[in-house]
């Protein structure tokens, strides 16, 4: 089994959870508990410009925590290896729930509440449905990325297009099977 370290502590890699603009997220275990280990990558992204990705993640995490965004706790950062260890929140992603046609009004209500915290703070997050996990009835934002608010990228203008089986969602799904 493959292992990865964070600040010299070893974790067994269970599986790849996903790849985003900034890194790869793995489900890992120390033998007692499961975590998410995010490895920052430096692959080009033609639609997004980054500075220091790790520092951005750490800064964004603090900003979103201050706003009360439900998220996994940041447990550790390994600056040398550009890795972040996060709390693992088990549950289905909104993406999976869209596929099953199980997104509920309560999920949308929780997103509206979240937007009421974000927008007055001049903040957008990445509303793509793979970035949200439902656990114990709570909607968690499992990414730490945030950006200055722009209406073109807010939930009502952009994000909602991927929270049901819209043409945009179906096109994305067809391209990523």
Place the predicted regions along the sequence by residue.
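Conserved structural core of kinase catalytic domains
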Residues: 69-108
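Juxta-kinase regulatory segment immediately upstream of eukaryotic protein kinase catalytic domains
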Residues: 1-13
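ATP-binding glycine-rich loop module of kinase domains
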Residues: 13-54
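Hydrophobic residue at the +6 position relative to the catalytic HRD Asp in the kinase catalytic loop
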Residues: 127-132
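C-lobe/activation-segment region of protein kinase-like
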Residues: 120-124, 135-177
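Protein kinase-like catalytic core scaffold
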Residues: 35, 70, 84, 140-142
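The N-lobe alphaC helix and its flanking beta3-alphaC-beta4 segment of protein kinase-like domains
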Residues: 49-67
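Conserved alphaE helix
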Residues: 106-117
């Amino acid at each position: 089994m493959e292992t990865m370290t964070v600040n010299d502590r070893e974790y067994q890699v269970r599986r790849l959870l996903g790849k985003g603009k900034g890194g790869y997220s793995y489900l890992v275990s120390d033998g007692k508990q499961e975590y998410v280990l995010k490895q920052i990558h430096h692959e080009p992204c033609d639609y997004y410009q980054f500075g220091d990705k790790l520092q951005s993640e750490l800064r964004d995490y603090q900003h979103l925590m201050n706003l009360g965004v439900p998220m996994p706790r940041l447990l550790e950062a390994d600056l040398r290896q550009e890795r972040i260890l996060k709390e693992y929140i088990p549950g289905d992603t909104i993406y999976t729930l869209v596929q099953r046609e199980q997104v509920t009004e309560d999920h949308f209500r929780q997103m509206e509440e979240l937007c009421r915290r974000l927008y007055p703070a001049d903040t957008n997050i990445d509303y793509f449905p793979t970035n949200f996990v439902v656990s114990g009835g709570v909607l968690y934002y499992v990414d730490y990325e945030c950006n200055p608010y722009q209406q073109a990228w807010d939930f009502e203008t952009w994000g909602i297009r991927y929270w049901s089986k819209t043409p945009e969602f179906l096109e994305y799904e067809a391209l990523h099977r």
